[in-house]
């Protein structure tokens, strides 16, 4: 037998041994959980759009308990739904769990010039978070409220026309048009409403329907060839659409920069408040000195390499792209679930309409009036408890071996929260856990956050930076609809909802009627 054949056999045996070693990781640790298949683990369970992977977590939690282990290709993941464990990882030991679970397709967050805030880690994450946070402050939201109002008016006009014809409406489709319209104007330089004629909507839908498909499964199994995989799979529909969208964002940002430069040369002062996130990100500055270059295990410390106090061109593109994806999907889904629950609970809808009539008597709803709609906020929070959207993205990566509640977690281990089970845990929420009960929030949400039992937008320092914007959009639209209409079910309404999805859990449709109140 030739030496080259022996080398080939040795390499083959080494590869097989490595994958079997990873696959048996939790067995050797004595941690129970679904084993799946060698090489794959259970990664193939998360690629079926008709059977959401996040709901697989819930099935396994019922079988294995609130803490169990899985492998996803070469990734080792601990799935948790114990609220104390969640709080420990996301809040108390944040310095040990400040990274996120990433795939080879996403690239190295420390080298990617367009790394979004959601994927960044360490001091780069701190810098991006500090620079981006003012963009989502109440002060900034006031500045862009006019943009949201325009889309609200356009959607209500469309709903008025459709409801007058007695149609059963798929509210999910209407809400997707609404959120895409806002994002187009805020992030893509869109100058007017393109609702129901937006060419970008199908591109974004493709990303969400195919975004966690076999491309991500293969990259999870063979991460060592990540760069090659990114080049090979760039032609797949979901990744090609992502590239197309980033090109559009580049054009919009370049156009804005050219306009600013021309105005400056002509001595023209900026007029009015920023109307979109392109302006807000371009204006982002910080008086804080940032540092980079620290070793991962010394995240809490700083070294002396100073970096920019403003966002670069590529960083703005990265933030706009993720804002587009996250803002489109999660807000549309939250609105859909809220509308469905109101339609199936008319007594709660009536109570909410009474609050809307009392606090917003005038045709125009103001920013300050939104903050007075306490029961509406309870309704949305309860909808997000019953239908948490993004279990698969509620994850962290352990970057320093540590001990959590008596369990050793090795560096490199992923932590994924089974949010669905957590939000439906009777030990946290009581025996009425499966009931739609907005009143449970009337005393505030601090108790549930402190328990680690509620994370619709994540938890801890990495909590979703855009949650205020999402709440503003939802409250503004629902208020304007409920001032004039009542959601009603029809014989076509699917009860209970059929749930689908990959990265998020979505209803296949939300078929309702709108009945005029006047």
UniProtKB/Swiss-Prot annotation:
Pfam families: p450. The keyword Electron transport does not apply. Heme binds at residue 464. One of its GO terms (molecular function) is oxidoreductase activity, acting on paired donors, with incorporation or reduction of molecular oxygen. Signal peptide: none annotated. InterPro entries: Cyt_P450, Cyt_P450_CS, Cyt_P450_E_grp-I, Cyt_P450_sf, Cytochrome_P450_3A. PROSITE patterns: CYTOCHROME_P450 (PS00086). Its cofactor is heme. Keywords: Heme, Iron, Metal-binding, Monooxygenase, Oxidoreductase. Gene3D superfamilies: Cytochrome P450. Its EC number is 1.14.-.-. The keyword Iron applies. It is an enzyme of class 1 (oxidoreductase). PANTHER family: CYTOCHROME P450 FAMILY 3, FATTY-ACID PEROXYGENASE. Belongs to the cytochrome P450 family. Cytochromes P450 are a group of heme-thiolate monooxygenases. They oxidize a variety of structurally unrelated compounds, including steroids, fatty acids, and xenobiotics. This is Putative cytochrome P450 CYP13A7.
């Amino acid at each position: 037998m030739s030496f080259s054949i022996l080398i080939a056999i040795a390499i083959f045996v080494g590869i097989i041994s490595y994958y079997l070693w990873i696959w048996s990781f939790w067995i050797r640790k004595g941690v129970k959980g679904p084993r799946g298949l060698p090489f794959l683990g259970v990664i193939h369970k998360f690629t079926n759009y008709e059977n959401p992977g996040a709901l697989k977590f819930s099935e396994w939690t019922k079988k294995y308990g609130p803490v169990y282990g899985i492998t996803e290709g070469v990734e080792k993941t601990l799935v948790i739904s114990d609220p104390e464990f969640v709080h420990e990882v996301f809040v108390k030991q944040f310095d040990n769990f400040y990274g996120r679970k990433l795939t080879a397709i996403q690239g190295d967050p420390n080298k990617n010039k367009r790394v979004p805030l959601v994927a960044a880690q360490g001091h780069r994450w701190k810098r991006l978070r500090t620079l981006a946070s003012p963009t989502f402050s109440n002060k900034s939201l006031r500045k862009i409220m006019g943009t949201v109002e325009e889309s609200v008016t356009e959607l209500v006009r469309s709903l008025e026309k459709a409801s007058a014809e007695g149609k059963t409406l798929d509210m999910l489709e209407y809400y997707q048009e609404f959120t895409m319209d806002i994002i187009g104007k805020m992030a893509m330089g869109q100058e007017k409403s393109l609702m129901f004629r937006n060419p970008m909507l199908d591109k974004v839908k493709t990303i969400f329907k195919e975004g966690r498909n076999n491309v991500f499964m293969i990259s999870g199994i063979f991460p060592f060839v990540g760069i090659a995989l990114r080049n090979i799979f760039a032609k797949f529909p979901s990744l090609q659409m992502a590239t197309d969208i980033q090109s559009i964002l580049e054009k919009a940002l370049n156009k804005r920069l050219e306009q600013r430069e021309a105005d400056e040369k002509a001595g023209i002062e900026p007029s009015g408040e920023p109307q979109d996130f392109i302006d807000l990100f371009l204006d982002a500055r910080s008086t804080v000195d940032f540092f980079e270059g620290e070793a991962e295990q010394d995240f809490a410390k700083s070294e002396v390499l100073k970096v920019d106090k403003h966002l670069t061109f590529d960083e703005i593109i990265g933030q706009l792209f993720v804002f587009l994806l996250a803002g489109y999907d999660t807000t549309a889904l939250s609105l859909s679930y809220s509308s469905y629950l109101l339609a199936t609970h008319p007594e709660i809808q009536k109570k909410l309409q009474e609050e809307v009539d009392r606090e917003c008597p005038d045709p125009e709803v103001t920013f300050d009036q939104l903050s007075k709609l306490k029961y509406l906020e309870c309704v949305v929070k309860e909808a997000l408890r019953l239908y948490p959207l993004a279990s698969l993205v509620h994850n962290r990566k352990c970057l320093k071996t540590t001990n959590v509640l008596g369990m050793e977690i090795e560096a490199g281990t992923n932590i994924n929260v089974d949010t669905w089970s957590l939000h439906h845990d009777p030990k946290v929420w009581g025996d009425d856990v499966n009931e739609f009960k907005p009143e449970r929030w009337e005393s505030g949400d601090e108790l549930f956050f402190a328990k680690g039992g509620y994370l619709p937008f994540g938890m801890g320092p990495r909590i979703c930076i855009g949650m205020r914007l999402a709440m503003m959009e939802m409250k503004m639209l629902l208020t304007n609809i409920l001032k004039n209409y009542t959601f009603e079910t029809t014989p076509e309404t699917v009860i209970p909802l059929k749930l689908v999805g990959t990265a998020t859990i979505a209803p296949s449709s939300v078929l309702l009627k709108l009945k005029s109140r006047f």
